[in-house]
């Protein structure tokens, strides 16, 4: 079990987020949303799955 989960925004590639119990869903089990564009955050363990599904580039620049 890890104590730290790294999130990344698929839209703006930001890594700052907020969590809320109101945002928890099947697609967003942690309830994490980007503080900049309000998109659902994804974790790095499922980022390849997300990128293949939406055909985004793998550039994760800050």
From Swiss-Prot:
Induction: By cold shock, 10 degrees Celsius (at protein level). Pfam families: YmcF-like. It comes from the Bacteria. Probably uses the non-canonical initiation codon AUU, which may limit its expression. Part of the Qin prophage. Belongs to the YmcF/YnqF peptide family. This is Protein YnfQ.
């Amino acid at each position: 079990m890890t104590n730290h989960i790294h999130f990344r925004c698929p839209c703006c590639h930001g890594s700052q987020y907020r969590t809320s119990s109101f945002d928890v869903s099947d697609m967003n089990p942690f309830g994490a949303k980007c503080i900049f564009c309000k998109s659902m955050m994804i974790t790095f363990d499922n980022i390849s799955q997300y990128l293949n599904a939406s055909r985004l580039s793998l550039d994760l620049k800050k």
